[in-house]
Each structure stands twice: as structure tokens, then as C-alpha cells.
Amino acid sequence: SQPISALFQDHRLPGMKGIADNGKLQLYINDQTAEVAVLDKRSGVIWRSNPEKRDSDTIASGVNKDMLSAQTRINFYNSYGQMSSVNSYTDSVAHGQIALELIDQGIRVSYQFGKEERGIDDLPQKLSKERYEELVAKMDSAGQRAMRLSYTQDKETGVYNRIDGALQGLQLQRTLAAFDAIGYTAEDLARDSEEHGLTYEKPIPRIFAISIEYSLDGDNLLVRVPASSIRYPEEYPVN
């Protein structure tokens, strides 16, 4: 999203931009963290969506500490009926996945939780000796090295098996890059899987979206979550 320009600022709210003023209240936002604040112009009282000194909180830790920086959380179910949750700080703001849009007397903050990441399932689980050699022959030395670390040959069958334990972090990225560099496609992956009696199904990305609208109305701050802004995969129903 485009950076939000400050209409005004206040020394009591460093890092925050004033975006709406209705004569009684002023609305501020930090466009990096999406936290908002409301200043009552008559009393000087400030209300914040998140604690001001949360970084120095000594009680909260882990995900609870992150929740001090979040504005919302989504609970959802997986295919086993187990409930998990994502929050707007850990799963959206921390990855720069927010968009801001000015509305009448306020602002709309749109969050995307999660991202479409490629992983181990985007690499063939098994490759015949011929197919392995065909692919490796097209790769540069870095790609060939990645393959040697990511696949091991079954001496009896000659088949190369993916070493799942090795495919994490940088090694996973290097191996994905090696396949990308030779133009390896999802169709190639489906074909290579089929050759060994394996079915390939692209994993469903666990991506959610939600918007929060903040606006001033007389003496009040109105906070709205438009139902139409809530999006989630069918496989992960939201509670």
C-alpha cells in the first residue's frame, strides 16, 4: 500500500500519524504496525489499541507477547477438527502484509495472514536413475551440488529418493532454485510422481484475510470488521 501522509502530529504519540479530526477527537495510526490511538482534544486523554510499553512487558512471553502488538486474531479449524489461530502481528504485520486506505473520518487496515510459500512437496519424492541424470545434466554446479545433498540413490532399485530431513531452510531453497533454473514445472512434478505410483496434490495455502475499519463519530471511535473482508480457504473454516 502507499504510505499514509500525516495531516497532523502530536509529540505524545511519536511514530504515529494523525489522519482524522472531528473537532472532539483525533485519530492516529502507526503505518508500520497498524496500531491506532485516539486523542480526546478536550481532556488530553489518549486511548491506544495496543499497550504503549509492551516491549518492556516482563510477564507476557512468546505468542502472548506478540498478542500485545496484535489488533485481531483469527481462530480456524484444520481437516482433523483441531483449532489453531493466527494473529495480525505475528502472521501479517511482521511480514509487511498490511494495506492502509483512508475512509471518511478514518482508515481501513487490511491484513493478509500467511503467504503462499513453496515447500518440500514441490520437489519430486522419487526419480528414476535416468530421470535424475537427465535433470542434473541441465543444472549448473550449484544445482548439481544441491541435488547430491537432497537425493540419495537406492542401490538395489537405482531410484533416487528425496532426503526429507535434509530439505529445510537454505538447503530447501537451493534445491527449489535448482529445479526452477531448468524450467521444472508442476506438470513435470505430476508426471514424475505418477511414474512411481505417487499422487501429487498441490498443498492448499493457508492464507486468510480480514479488514478493520476505524472511524470517528462524535464522541466515539467506531471499529468495524466488514464480513465481506473475511476470506479463508474452504479447508480451514474460521470459527
For each feature predicted by the language model, list its residue ranges.
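Long, leucine/valine-rich, helix-dominated scaffolding and oligomerization segments
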Residues: 102-109, 201, 208, 223-226
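Short linear interaction motifs
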Residues: 8-9, 89-93, 190-210, 215, ...
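Acidic (Asp/Glu-rich), glycine- and aromatic
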Residues: 203, 224-239
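Intrinsically disordered, low-complexity segments enriched in small residues
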Residues: 2-3, 177-190, 198-201
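Acidic-aromatic substrate-binding/catalytic surfaces of carbohydrate-active enzymes
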Residues: 15-185
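Short alpha-helical segments and helix-capping/turn motifs at coil-helix boundaries
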Residues: 13, 22-24, 93-95, 207-211, ...
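Short, Gly/Pro- and small/polar-rich lid/capping loops
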Residues: 2-12
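Short beta-strand segments that buttress and anchor functional surface loops
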Residues: 109-115, 194-202, 227
